[in-house]
A protein has these predicted regions:
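Flavin-dependent oxidoreductase catalytic cores
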Residues: 1-283
């Protein structure tokens, strides 16, 4: 069964194995993929689908050193190298769009960029920087509604850029404590406006991003990654988490996304994502 072909949206996959996203930090020039990155993915084109390393839709989302972006012409050209190399080997590939939000350090970011998040509370722990080694995470600036609207549009533009580069679609990284999950998680999102204060408010940013990306490139080209009981980057479970994610999945289901990718952090000490929750998300 693993080796049987599968149709994902309108995309024919040669088998049912998916290469999960893995941050590699090899984009040393202007956060653009290079020939080495293209070779890496081409070597793995035997998977039915590759999901790339986390790729920022914005200069403000480049929290880690040397991760790729998808907002500049140079980056789009770099991803075209990757897409062409994978397709030449018969593979399919989605770009994972990851805005790091508060999981960041200013030393890793280009000039003019800033660390942002749902609130102004820094992520606990350290972030590696090339300039000074491990440093405490930078304190973010709390995003206002104009910032949120701009970021939603950046995700949509990055989706268009991915398709323009020849990639087959995008996965929205809504897991592991990055910006989308920072809004979803009640331990991090303590806002009292329309983007917090309730399950509906906390879900709002994720839904707006997904809607914008679907409008930009089509529902069959957009998936999302979620970690309902995540423990990574100071998130953690909270009261009502299962009910919130079922409601989120229902709204995402109305958009007809290509897939939902669920991450289980039980190996890190978090509660496992129950079979019941997975079934309810799948409905």
């Amino acid at each position: 069964m693993l080796f049987d072909s599968f149709t994902l949206g309108g995309l024919k996959l040669s088998n049912r194995m998916v290469m999960a996203p893995m941050t590699r930090s090899r984009c040393v020039e202007n956060n653009a993929p290079n020939a080495l990155v293209a070779e890496h993915y081409a070597q793995r084109a035997g998977a039915g689908l590759i999901v790339t390393e986390g790729t920022s839709p914005s200069p403000n989302g480049l929290g880690y050193a040397r991760i790729p972006g998808l907002y500049s012409p140079e980056q789009v050209a770099g991803w075209k190298l990757v897409a062409d190399a994978v397709h030449a080997k018969g593979g399919k590939i989605f770009a994972q769009l990851m805005h790091t939000g508060r999981v960041s350090h200013a030393l890793n970011m280009p000039a003019g960029a800033e660390v942002v998040g749902p609130t102004d509370v820094a992520c606990p722990g350290d972030m590696y920087t090339d300039a000074k080694g491990p440093q405490p995470h930078s304190a973010p600036r709390a995003m206002n509604e104009a910032d949120i609207a701009k970021t939603v549009e950046e995700f949509a533009t990055a989706s268009k850029n991915a398709v323009a580069a020849g990639l087959d679609g995008v996965e929205l990284h809504g897991a592991n404590g990055y910006l989308i999950e920072q809004f979803l998680n009640a331990n991090v999102n303590t806002r009292t406006d329309g983007y917090g204060g309730s399950a509906e408010g906390r879900n709002r940013f994720a839904i707006e991003v997904a809607k914008a990306c679907v409008a930009a490139v089509g529902k069959e080209k957009v998936g999302i990654r979620l970690s309902p009981h995540g423990a990574f980057n100071a998130t953690g479970p909270f009261a009502g988490v299962d009910e919130q994610y079922v409601a989120l999945a229902a709204e995402l289901g109305k958009l007809g996304l290509a897939y939902v990718h669920i991450v289980d952090h039980s190996s890190m000490g978090a509660p496992p994502v129950s079979h019941e929750l997975k079934q309810n998300i799948r409905k």
